[in-house]
Amino acid sequence: MFNKNDYIIYGSMSVCKIIDIIEEDNVYVGRKSYYVIRPVYSDKNTIIKIPTDNKKVFMRHLLSQKEIMSIIENIPNLEIIKIENDKERSMHYKSVIKSSICEELTELIKGININEQDKLSIGKKLSKTEEDFKKAAEKLIDEEFATVLNIPVQDVQSFILDHIS
């Protein structure tokens, strides 16, 4: 259960703030409670109403500073699984983005970065698909880490690099 003014992760929308919890009558199910949320970093005019018993879209509390620092410190030790089949790799990436689990997102980013370095060494570039997945994962990581660590979103990547170097 979440409370008013909590910051949460809501699906792939990233960080949202619960601006209210309301009850409304619903023709089909009677009286029902809803979280009223607003994205923190994207369109601030967007307001979303979600049933408090929502099971369809992933929602969770933000990580703590301690949990984030632990994830950052563990980045050098992450084992990267290479998936050779493009379709399987794409499905895996979609699953990771949908889960919004920071440990998996950092693995995805690290894996794509390694793949990018390998390709650059032979004069090739990342595919548009991999670039898009990397951007989506970085957006989720950057926004959650920025909110919890109270730093600007654009400073998150350098913050991470400073702490793993």
Model-found features: residue ranges?
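A short macromolecule-binding patch
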Residues: 38-52
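Charge/polar-rich, low-complexity and marginally structured segments
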Residues: 53-165
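Absolute protein N-terminus
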Residues: 1-2
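Loop/turn positions that initiate beta-strands
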Residues: 5-6
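Short, solvent-exposed secondary-structure boundary/capping segments
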Residues: 24-36
